[in-house]
């Protein structure tokens, strides 16, 4: 297990800190499950217990006992499969056992609604930030950059001062899944906020390029949960004013969804949106086009052809008073 995390995930796969934490949590939950449901203490757990039936039961337990969503279940499943595919090479004598576990399929669920904020919703949330305090100015800069860049929360928290180019063309370099780098253009207004933030926090010095761009009170990089806390704080305030604009549940990822939807609604090509978001395939980006009913309606209206068939001014049944009264009585 130690080699899997330190050698394979970190050195060979180049997994992000977010991925490593997610995998770590998966195995912590697995140990909890074995201890609670199989009555085996952690020090007595052996590889012989790692069977397909045990893993499937564990995934079911996540849903039933921990109230995990299907998406979370599938993330845990992916972590397990990654580890046991690794074990095929590390322990080939039990190859069939590891292959069985690796064959577990992700669970299909109902097509969930893609939550995103309208432009008014984003504005309302940002308006709740108190820019009279240094913490508030940090929060506004962070949230504006999160939205404008379409970054994942893990990409945001891993930013350093040197990730930002404050000269034209304004860009931020994000490190995404698999340590893949992508350069995303940033609006001038947002970059002005970033530059002011750097100056106020004495970060506009070349010697501080490796410092975290957004940190907590101890100078450590802000965590994903820290960003989520900030967002939920302002979302709660905004929800009181206009509950119809702010979903009951909100996470940092909603800024990414919102940015993609707003670009799409503005007529930006899906291929360009794909590059901003760092998707491997444009098929992944197409979820935004499928989610926007307004765009579907506009497309149908644009494709409408008048076939010359029109509704008569007076319906045939309206000519017959008795028939009309009869039909109305059915209601």
Q: Predicted segments — roles?
A:
Residues 1-331:
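Conserved catalytic core of the tyrosine transesterase superfamily
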């Amino acid at each position: 297990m130690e080699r899997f995390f330190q050698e394979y995930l970190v050195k060979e796969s180049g997994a992000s800190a977010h991925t490593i934490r997610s995998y770590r949590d998966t195995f912590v939950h697995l140990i909890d499950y074995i201890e609670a449901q199989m009555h085996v203490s952690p020090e007595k757990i052996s590889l012989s217990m790692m069977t397909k039936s045990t893993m499937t039961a564990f995934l079911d337990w996540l849903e039933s006992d921990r109230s995990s969503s299907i998406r979370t279940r599938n993330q845990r499943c992916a972590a397990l499969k990654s580890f046991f595919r690794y074990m095929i090479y590390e322990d080939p004598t039990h190859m069939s056992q590891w292959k069985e576990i690796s064959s577990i399929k992700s669970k299909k669920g109902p097509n969930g609604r893609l939550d995103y904020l309208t432009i008014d919703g984003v504005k309302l949330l940002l308006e709740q930030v108190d820019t009279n305090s240094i913490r508030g100015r940090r929060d506004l800069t962070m949230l504006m950059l999160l939205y404008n860049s379409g970054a994942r929360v893990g990409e945001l928290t891993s930013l350093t001062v040197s990730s930002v180019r404050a000269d034209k063309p304004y860009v931020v370099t994000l490190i995404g899944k698999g340590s893949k780098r992508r350069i995303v253009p940033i609006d001038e207004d947002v970059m002005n906020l970033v530059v002011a933030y750097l100056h106020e926090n004495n970060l506009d010095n070349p010697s501080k390029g490796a410092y975290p761009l957004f940190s907590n009170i101890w100078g450590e990089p802000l965590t994903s949960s820290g960003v989520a806390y900030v967002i939920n704080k302002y979302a709660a305030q905004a929800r009181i004013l206009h509950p119809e604009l702010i979903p009951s549940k909100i996470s940092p990822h909603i800024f990414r969804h919102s940015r993609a939807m707003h670009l799409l609604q503005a007529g930006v090509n899906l291929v360009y949106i794909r590059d901003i978001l760092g998707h491997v395939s444009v098929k992944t980006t197409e979820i935004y086009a499928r989610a926007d009913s307004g765009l579907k309606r506009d497309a149908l209206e644009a494709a409408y052809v008048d076939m010359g068939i029109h509704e008569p001014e007076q319906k045939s049944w309206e000519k017959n008073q008795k028939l009309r009264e009869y039909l109305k009585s059915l209601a």
